[in-house]
Amino acid sequence: MPACARVLDFPGSTLAPAFFDVHIHGAMGHDLMEATPGALQAVASFLATRGVGNFLATTVTAPMDVTLRSLEGLAKLLDRPPVEGQAHAIGIHLEGPFLSHVKRGVHPPASLLEPDIATFDRFFEAAGGYVRLMTLAPELPGAAELAAHATARGVRISMGHSNATAAETRTAMAAGAVSATHTFNAMRPLDHREPGILGVVLTSDELFAELICDGIHTAPEMVKLWWRAKGPERALLVTDAMSATGMPDGEYQLGGFPVQVAEGRAMAGGVLAGSVLTLDRALANFLRFTAAPLDQALRLVTANPAAMTGLQEQVGALAVGRTASLVAVDAAGKLTASVIGGN
């Protein structure tokens, strides 16, 4: 050990890779679709304080010109090298516009589109190839063809904002879909005769599944059900956090529309509009709701999102030669220390 080295000890804590959030729209008063250096820096700096080392900048459905402009701006920002002490935007999650009108949530209906390979290619090129993940409703005409095309271009497909039947869901899986977006939310409910997308998500061993574990989007009992179904290899926690995260209650923006935030709930038109959750709190909530072993729970914010996105050679593990991005957490999942980007 070099003479100048400092030894840091955190008794009772567990060392783990820094967290990876594959579904986040913003924080600290900024929406990532602003695609400005100031917005990205504010979000990335805040995430680092919550133990996040890497994230996918997530879009929301918007008019075509707005989406293209945001993707072009994000691509330029993602071309820059990572900054010490800030979470690294390692790619883009395209959430919309290929979503169901029936399960759109707060995504503006006028900007929703049916799956179209040419439109996707415009998005992909505008984003400089940084689209790593795309949410897609399997039941839409052309969804399977788009899933296969996007998969061939290296984009992982997550099924969500969907009213799909079980058969439609399995068709999307055969075309390349690997995950489910914020399981239970904006998703056809379970039925004992037509299990739908949710039934397939919960019973397919090969599918990953996101969950927003804030106690608002999903009740603790349903978190337990999800955990028992997906287990430590296929479950992953996300925040779906929007610009109000880390800020006081008030009115904020998600994409281009206003969201009212009060007492931990982000609402637009009476519908949940993202969250103000942080990934460290999601981990602590998950442990409290399920009593899962800490080593298994940590996979949900590290190794599993890395595997789902195909980025496991870059993030999600402690390995010699990788940039030092790591966290220490106590037995309850509370963050006790973090080193992000070597700082």
At which residue positions do the language-model features occur?
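Conserved, mostly hydrophobic/aromatic
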Residues: G12, H23, L47, L94, ...
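Conserved phosphate-binding/catalytic loop of the ribokinase/pfkB sugar-kinase fold
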Residues: S100-G128
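Short acidic/histidine-rich active-site segments
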Residues: P232-G255, Q260-L279, G321
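Active-site core of metal-dependent hydrolases
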Residues: D121, E125-M247
